[in-house]
C-alpha cells in the first residue's frame, strides 16, 4: 500500500491505492507530496515529522500535520487486520530520524489508536528479518536499506545470537 493520501472536495480522506490513483489524475489532491503552507513546495510528509509543517489541501480548506497524515496511513493499515484487536505496533524509521522525529512517529501511532509503539531503525529491522541473530551468522555485518527515497546503513556485530549495533547512518 503506498503511503499516499488524498482529500476529495467534501473533505473525505483516501489512503493507499485510491489516493495514489487520485494523485496520478491531479497531484493537488493526493500526496506523498502536498503543498506546504502558501508556497508551491511539494514534499513527502514523512520527511517533515516533528517540524510543525502544515500541509494545505488545495481543493478543500484544510490543513494537516505530518503526524496527522501518518496517523491516517497507520489507521488504514490497522483496518486491514480483520476481526483482531491489538494495541501495539512496531514501526521502522529511517536511520537519520532525530529524537523529535521519533517522538512524532510515536504520537502518530497514538493518534491511530495504538497504546504502545516501538521503533526500529530500518537497517536494523532488515538485519533482523534476514536472521542475523542466528548463531551461525557470527561476525561483523554491514546492512544496507535501499528504502523508498532513503539510503540507510548499519554496522553490526553478531556473536552467539546477540546483535550489537556499532553505527547507523542514512540520508
Task: Please provide the spans of the model-predicted regions.
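Oxyanion-binding/catalytic loops of NTP- or PPi-dependent enzymes
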Residues: 1-47, 60-63, 82-171
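Adenine-nucleotide phosphate-binding core of ATP-dependent small-molecule kinases
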Residues: 56-78
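Intrinsically disordered or highly flexible coil/loop and linker segments, enriched in small
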Residues: 54-55, 83
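Amphipathic alpha-helical blocks
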Residues: 49-51
Amino acid at each position: 500500500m503506498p503511503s499516499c493520501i488524498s482529500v476529495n472536495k467534501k473533505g473525505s480522506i483516501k489512503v493507499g491505492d485510491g489516493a495514489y490513483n487520485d494523485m496520478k489524475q491531479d497531484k493537488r489532491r493526493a500526496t506523498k507530496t502536498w503543498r506546504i503552507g502558501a508556497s508551491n513546495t511539494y514534499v513527502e510528509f514523512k520527511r517533515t515529522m516533528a517540524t510543525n509543517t502544515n500541509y494545505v489541501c488545495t481543493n478543500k480548506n484544510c490543513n494537516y500535520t505530518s503526524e496527522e497524515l501518518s496517523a491516517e496511513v497507520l489507521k488504514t493499515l490497522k483496518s486491514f487486520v480483520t476481526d483482531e484487536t491489538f494495541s501495539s505496533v512496531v514501526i521502522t524509521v529511517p536511520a537519520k530520524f532525530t529524537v523529535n522525529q521519533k517522538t512524532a512517529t510515536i504520537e502518530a501511532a497514538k493518534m491511530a489508536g495504538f497504546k504502545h509503539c516501538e521503533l526500529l531503525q530500518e537497517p536494523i529491522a532488515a538485519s533482523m528479518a534476514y536472521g542475523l541473530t542466528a548463531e551461525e551468522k557470527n561476525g561483523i555485518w554491514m546492512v544496507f536499506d535501499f528504502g523508498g527515497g532513503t539510503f540507510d546503513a548499519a554496522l553490526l556485530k553478531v556473536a552467539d545470537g546477540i546483535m550489537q549495533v556499532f553505527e547507523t547512518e542514512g540520508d
